[in-house]
Amino acid sequence: KMLIEAQGTLCLGCHDTIQAKIATAKSQHQPVRDGECVACHNPHGAAFKPLLNAAFPESFYAPYKVGSYALCFGCHPKGLVEFARTSMTKFSNGDRNLHELHINKSEKGRTCRVCHSVHGADQDRLVRSLSPSFGKWAIPINLQVTESGGTCIVGCHKPKSYDRYRPVSYQ
């Protein structure tokens, strides 16, 4: 109530690279779309970079620990990455939870930022078209969404399709 402008307008007035990105984004994170930057950030200081309200992994790979994803779990249910079998995500092959498959590992789990751009992305479901740097290379990601699943093409790998109702077999 003491701000000189609406929160989102005020924040994006300085963070113009984020503003440019979300202006052309096909999908936007709900707090960004609603101009609620403080849902994730504390502009007056925070223990987590970059001014985050809670922990969020900074690296490409990380062992899965529930506390490391405290920022995400402030809004999203933990079951998105903890349950191997669930219907709570659209990213599943049958009932096999593909978020859990990629993230929930004791050593080299991929972090959310590998596939998702937290402010906005040029593909559906906040999926980025280039993963953050993996060494000197940014990995291209191409997501093709269907009504019941989709196909993901990552880097040099063959396409992987998934379907919630008619699971794709990879045996």
Region spans (language model):
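Inter-heme linker and motif-flanking segments adjacent to c-type heme-binding CXXCH motifs
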Residues: 1-171
